[in-house]
Amino acid sequence: MSLPSIKTTNSYCVVLWCDQGSATINAPDRVVQVMAGDVVLAPHGAFVTGHGVVLPMAFPDFDGGEHTRRLHMGTAWSKRMIFEFSRSLLGETRPSECIAALFDDRARPPRVPEPQAARKVAQKLIAYPADQTPLLEFAQLHNISSRTLQRQFVASTGFTFSEWRAALRVSVAADLLAHDFRIGQVSQMVGFSATSSLTRAFKRHTGDTPSSFTSPRMHAVCEQQPPMIPATTTFARASDDIALWIYSGTATVTTPGYCRFMGAGETVTIPSGTSTRLDVSAGSVALPVPLAAAHDDLTLSDVLAASVNPLAAVELQRLSAQERADVEQVLVPSV
């Protein structure tokens, strides 16, 4: 299945879920290959190429940091992540707690230093974590003293150059271990001279060994069932005429003087500027689609193609607390 390249147009990080096939995430700091069941948190500027179905989710109030991170969650999470995609299209500003928690780990990459020379060194190491270039040589490349470069790292990140590099390697190693690479392989891939060196660095930066750090995390994410999809109620207004498609389950759409109960596969038109109440049942997913893109045989790929097209993308704005209070007595489901 061929889809257009996805470019993140927001100024904040984006969550990317590979639902089908495989693709490439081209992030500012690294290039990541993904397959079905992978979720990636990428900074502003990331774009997707390839033939997989990758759902981009933008959450303005979610600070995911400056580094790209990937987890393999398994395809059992598909419906739960499509629900998360729906939340982003319906105006939510933060991911669900269970999704945000996936990236709240002790192997988070270290902060990128701000001074120009140190930042360029950091960017080189982010692109090539196994690079063995010593501090002195990096300093000479940037025409500064090694002391100055060291001070830049410490002042901006709290780490010496060597510890910053170790912290970065630990973060990359955690990602590789999550994808079933052996510890010995990972040690070499990220630039440690021996498995024992990786283990010591892991203990310093996470408090655990690679095996004890990875196993509980991946058991929790990959082996357990994803959380149930909760029932949701959304009060919103569209900037343009849109169609609301029930991807799965059931939902009730209420506008002034109108109420409709809907099942999977059905669509309803919501005119521009109309205050709308959307009640989605537990276990169900509803997706807004530009009216021009709606048809009788919609697929997830159709919604994706429309959502990443800046000329057709749906803009659905949540009602403010005051606006919701004003319409709540009017928008009462009657079915």
From Swiss-Prot:
InterPro entries, per the entry: Homeodomain-like_sf (IPR009057), HTH_AraC (IPR018060), HTH_AraC-typ_CS (IPR018062)
Keywords for this protein: DNA-binding, Repressor, Transcription, Transcription regulation
Cited Gene3D superfamilies: Homeodomain-like
Annotated HTH araC/xylS-type domain residues: 119-216
GO molecular function: DNA-binding transcription factor activity; sequence-specific DNA binding
UniProt record, GO biological process: regulation of DNA-templated transcription
Induction line: Repressed by DtxR under iron excess.
Segments of the chain annotated as binding DNA: 136-157, 183-206
General function of this protein: Under iron limitation, represses the acn (aconitase), catA (catechol 1,2 dioxygenase), leuCD (isopropylmalate dehydratase), narKGHJI (nitrite/nitrate transporter and nitrate reductase), sdhCAB (succinate dehydrogenase), pta (phosphotransacetylase) and katA (catalase) genes.
Database matches in PANTHER family: HTH-TYPE TRANSCRIPTIONAL REGULATOR NIMR
Protein name in UniProt: HTH-type transcriptional regulator RipA
Originating organism: Corynebacterium diphtheriae (strain ATCC 700971 / NCTC 13129 / Biotype gravis)
Lineage of the species this protein comes from: Bacteria, Bacillati, Actinomycetota, Actinomycetes, Mycobacteriales
